Amino acid sequence: MSLRHFLTLSDLTKQELENLIKRASELRHMQHAGEIYQPFVGRTLGMIFEKSSTRTRISFETGMGQFGGSAIFLSPNDTQLGRGEPIEDSARVISSMVDIIMIRTFGHEKVETFAKYSSVPIINALTDEFHPCQLLADMQTYYEHRGSIENKIVTWVGDGNNMCASYMQAANQFGFELRVAAPYGFEPDPELMKRFSHCVSIVENVQEAAKDSHLIVTDVWASMGQESEQNTRARRFSSYQVTPSLLDKADSEVVFMHCLPAHRGEEISHDMLDDPRSVVWDEAENRLHAQKALMEFLLKDKIKI
């Protein structure tokens, strides 16, 4: 297989994504059964973080260790990237010493440039524009709880942010209808709306957006780097809180997801994570298994079976 990167969901075909989700579920069962599977012995993952994270670091580092490989954590203080070295130079050097690289940063153009000059696969672990790894975990979680998401209705509640953008791509790739309930001025990127208008719609009324939905998803009102907007956003999003009563408007088989960390009392009610329809803890764990499946896919020509 030629060099492949995972910068957005659109980098994989529908069939590849569906196979990856099923493989992630298999890996979860293998891990829970105590099965040892180490195809990455002697392989190294480079982890470049310009944005901090709990779940991203733990899931990638643990996953690489479970696969028998090793992971190197690189913060801006640990690399010349933080001192102004051109991205293309860092990409050439770092990729010559590791087997695969994940990057969690701000501008999406950084991971695109890194991928252009890298000799190994690049994984987008989050940018301001997209969060594709989280969508792999979300799709795996829905698959495990409810089966195929094709032809289902998904409701996104809140900011049209990077998570929302990746859900728009997922709607196209996995074949579901996405309703976005966002206040005026916080809708998704117009270009993305135009591209995915066949499967994505804006429904400003939250109650209407939730009607008959099979999956309801939300995220924080102010993402990392938007802390100065917190008070303004809290006012604008006050009627966009996800609660058990909102889920009552949805399909009887609805499930709720949140990529975490969650702010109880803001985008969700204090009791939402504990509602029996919430699958957020499985969703969080599945970051580990989905990313293991992704790394296995990207390095499948080099692994030991």
Curated annotation (Swiss-Prot):
Superkingdom, natural source: Bacteria
MF GO annotations: amino acid binding; ornithine carbamoyltransferase activity
Positions of L-ornithine binding: N162, D219, S223, M224
One GO term of the biological process aspect: L-arginine biosynthetic process
First-tier enzyme category under EC: transferase
SUPFAM superfamilies the record matches: Aspartate/ornithine carbamoyltransferase
UniProt-listed Enzyme Commission number(s): 2.1.3.3
Pathway: Amino-acid biosynthesis; L-arginine biosynthesis; L-arginine from L-ornithine and carbamoyl phosphate: step 1/3
Catalytic activity field: carbamoyl phosphate + L-ornithine = L-citrulline + phosphate + H(+)
Principal subcellular localisation of the protein: cytoplasm
Membrane-crossing segments per the record: none
Pfam families with a match to the protein in the record: OTCace (PF00185), OTCace_N (PF02729)
NCBIfam families: orni_carb_tr, PRK00779.1
Family: Belongs to the aspartate/ornithine carbamoyltransferase superfamily. OTCase family.
Official protein name in the record: Ornithine carbamoyltransferase
Taxonomic path: Bacteria, Pseudomonadati, Pseudomonadota, Gammaproteobacteria, Moraxellales
